[in-house]
Amino acid sequence: LGRNKALVRAWPGVVEAAQLIGSDQIQGRCTIAGNLCNASPAADSVPALLAAKAKVVIVGPGGTRRTAVENIVTGPGKTSLGKGEIVKAIVLPDRPAKSGDAYLRFIPRSEMDIAVCSAGVSLTLGTGNVVKQVRVALGAVAPTVVLVPKAARAIVGTRLDDDALMKLTAACEAACSPIDDKRGTVEYRTEVAGVLARRAA
């Protein structure tokens, strides 16, 4: 994906997320659709795709259907795909002017590790560089990737001033319900998720 210059310009956060999945060998054989359908709460591509408002094209015995990315994963290792269905394509929307996206994750090692928590943000600026539209998604902090509308509402109509960003942070922290394991405590994941979302915005 990183070789597609138009895609990198339009959706740098999605491309960044995809390039963090596995090694070069894995990326040469696998797809971001596979990363989505693996249904891991910590999947790198999913927060970026949710923030981007991506759609998936599904084919199966009943024909072809289209749905939002957030409708695919229903729980850890579980999807809404029916028997015989596969994801044929992931479709990103046209990019409005004055828009950008970003994906950030925290991992204990430098590469090929599972995210302790992650955040994807996509936003569009309006007149006077005021935030017009935004979507915020968090990974590895709940059984599925979480879209956080309250975090988006916290910064719409602002110029990303400190007060607005702190409200976004608080909304992200409130949306977290992570597990407690050797890679991070509940409190740690919750705090870092808010920090990542603020930085991505």
Segments the model singles out, each with a brief description of its role:
Residues 1-201:
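C-terminal structural segment of proteins
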